[in-house]
Each structure stands twice: as C-alpha cells, then as structure tokens.
Amino acid sequence: MSNYRDIAWQGLWKNNPGLVQLLGLCPLLAVTATLTNAIGLGLATLVVLVGSNVLVSLVREFVPKEIRIPVFVMIIAALVTCVQLLINAYAYGLYLSLGIFLPLIVTNCVIIGRAEAFASRNSVVKAAFDGLMMGLGFTLVLMLLGACREILGQGTLFDGADLLLGDWAKGLTIHLWQVDTNFLLAMLPPGAFIAMGFLIAIKNMIDKQLEARKPALEAAPAVTRARITKVS
C-alpha cells in the first residue's frame, strides 16, 4: 500500500509532470485559454497515458531493447488515433478547438517518459496506477492554468462547456464579471508563461514550508509515560 501511496504522491505533487518535470509545455501553454479546453486535452492525455502504460507493461517481455522506443511510439500513436477519432465523432467542436495539439499528444514527453522509465519495468497494475496518477497530475495543472487564464481573460468559467458535454452544458457557463474587451495578455501564450511561473513559484513555496517543518518535528523530544505505583 505504501508503494502505491508513493506513486500517487509522485504523480500528483512531488514529481508532477507539469510543475516539476516541465514536460508537455507546448500543449499546456497553448490550449489552456479556457477551462473547457484544458479538461478536454487533460482527459485525452490521461486516457492515452493509462492505455500506453498498460500496453507497454504487457509487451515489455517480448520487445527487444534495441527497438523498444519505436514500438512504444507506435503504441502511443495508435492510442492517440483512437482518442482523436472518438473526440471527432462525439465532440466535434472540442476537436476543432484543440486542433493540432490533439494528435501532438503522440510527442508528449510525459507519455513516452513514463513508458520507458516506469511501465517497461513494472507490472500492469502498477503501470496503470502510475499512468493514472501522472495523468491526473498533468490534468489538474491544465485545469488550474485554464481556470486562471479564463477568469482573468474573459471573466468566465466553463465557457464553451457545450463543446465537451453537449448542448445541455451551455447553462454551465459562469459569468464572474462583465468585461467589455478580453484581457489579451491572459489569453495569449505570454500570459500562459507568466501564469505557469506563478504556479511553479507557489508550489516551491509550499515545498519549502513543508521542509522547514520537518526539522522542528524531528527535534521535538519524545514524551515518555512514567508509571506511578501507589504505596499504601
């Protein structure tokens, strides 16, 4: 159980693909103009990451080491193609909104990195759990960045939710305040870089505070219980 807890901690926080490894920055910065786009790309990446980890773990004993990277890339490309076709069929608006960044999931270093570093060396269950945690960590960063940029740029949340969930989701859009013109800096890639820098800085501050508390806890004297014997 502690092993799985460590895998979850690595993927969600300590070794987060977006905030620590800084992998997949191209789609992370380009697509997160709205929360809806961030959720769509995050879920697509999550599905591919879990699927590729499972398949790589299944075939790891049969693939020669010399050709393992091309085989891993082919597995990832096949999964991305399936996800792309599904989004094209059931969420065409989101498919158009994500554009070229959807097929570019194939080149996402997070996916090929986990396939090589973890899935090819561990069991199917552990590989699937690692893919799930890394995918969730990446998706959470996408969502947080997308929410910040959408709020600052448009004053809304869940704008275009119907692209992901259908026409019924048009009512999910939240208007936080009325803006005459969008704040372009937040909507464009330079704003994404700035917002990403703030997120990384906040994480580093939290990590430093956690590290500072450890010596104090370790230096605290242990409390021993004294036994009192009543003498009559």
From Swiss-Prot:
It is a multi-pass membrane protein. It is found in: Cell inner membrane. The keyword Transferase does not apply. GO terms for cellular component: plasma membrane. Its main location: membrane. Its EC number is 7.-.-.-. One of its GO terms (biological process) is electron transport chain. InterPro entries: NqrDE/RnfAE, RnfE. It comes from the Bacteria. Pfam families: Rnf-Nqr (PF02508). The chain crosses the membrane at residues 18-38, 39-59, 69-89, 93-113, 127-147, 182-202. The keyword Cell inner membrane applies. Part of a membrane-bound complex that couples electron transfer with translocation of ions across the membrane. The complex is composed of six subunits: RnfA, RnfB, RnfC, RnfD, RnfE and RnfG. Belongs to the NqrDE/RnfAE family. This is Ion-translocating oxidoreductase complex subunit E. It comes from Shewanella loihica (strain ATCC BAA-1088 / PV-4). The lineage of its organism: Bacteria, Pseudomonadati, Pseudomonadota, Gammaproteobacteria, Alteromonadales.
